[in-house]
From Swiss-Prot:
GO terms for biological process: glycerol metabolic process. It holds the Pfam family DUF6905. This is Putative glycerol transporter Lin0368. It is a multi-pass membrane protein. The lineage of its organism: Bacteria, Bacillati, Bacillota, Bacilli, Bacillales. Residues 118-143 are annotated as: Disordered. Could be involved in the glycerol uptake either via facilitated diffusion or active transport. GO terms for cellular component: membrane. It is found in: Membrane.
Amino acid sequence: MKFFRGMIGFCIAGMIVMSVWTPLAENYGIFGGYLAAFIIIGPMWFMNHHVGLIENDEDAAFVDMAVGIGICGIMRDVFMRGGGELVSSLPTIGLVAIGAVLAGIVAAAIEKDMARKHEAKQEKTEPGMNIKEEERLNENQLV
């Protein structure tokens, strides 16, 4: 049931974004884009994440509405203009995947660094010594 709730949430968000955002942006310019972001994404986020149509487990990768909106946009063009649209979007999808992998690597490095700094704060040091001095002493086995 969780899968179907997520699919419904993704589909609703994707269809509304694809049908409303472009006319607002075309008719009202930049203001229309901001207006669309406010009147579409806000309520869709509330429905999907706050109400709980899309559930994200603590131990799983976070899946946001952007995935559903992106898939909806790609498939809309495939249905309207044919399979060539999917083929022409593959380089963009590939670059997005590479960006996601790089972002994951950077996020993991940041988390690792934050954990290391947190552990360093937890360690007790000798009065008047900082952690680096104590590490140097431990490496030289002077303690």
